[in-house]
């Protein structure tokens, strides 16, 4: 009986460990996404038709050919 209890305890521990490992991998992209939203909210951004070097500089539009525009 003690062996069965020990076996069940080990099995439960292994399942818990596997769940925690798999669950942790899924949370990371969400954290990065939310962190990006937070960082863009704190800083100034370039309005449409404004000059840009990187896509992150534009407000709600894309940076194409060094200008923030809806069509890129």
Curated annotation (Swiss-Prot):
The presence of a 'disulfide through disulfide knot' structurally defines this protein as a knottin. The cysteine framework is VI/VII (C-C-CC-C-C). One of its GO terms (molecular function) is ion channel inhibitor activity. Transmembrane segments: none annotated. It comes from Conus lividus. This is Conotoxin LiC53. Disulfide bonds join 45-59, 52-63, 58-68. InterPro entries: Conotoxin (IPR004214). GO terms for cellular component: extracellular region. Keywords: Cleavage on pair of basic residues, Disulfide bond, Knottin, Neurotoxin, Secreted, Signal, Toxin. Residues 24-41 form a propeptide. Residues 1-23 form the signal peptide. Expressed by the venom duct. It comes from the Eukaryota. Belongs to the conotoxin O2 superfamily. It holds the Pfam family Conotoxin. It is found in: Secreted. The keyword Nucleotide-binding does not apply. Its main location: secreted. The keyword Disulfide bond applies.
């Amino acid at each position: 009986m003690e062996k069965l209890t020990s076996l069940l305890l080990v099995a439960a521990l292994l399942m818990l460990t596997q769940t925690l490992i798999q669950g942790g991998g899924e949370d990371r992209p969400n954290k990065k996404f939310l962190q990006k939203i937070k960082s863009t909210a704190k800083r100034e951004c370039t309005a449409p038709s404004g000059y840009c070097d990187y896509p992150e500089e534009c407000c709600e539009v894309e940076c194409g050919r060094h200008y923030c525009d809806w069509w890129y």
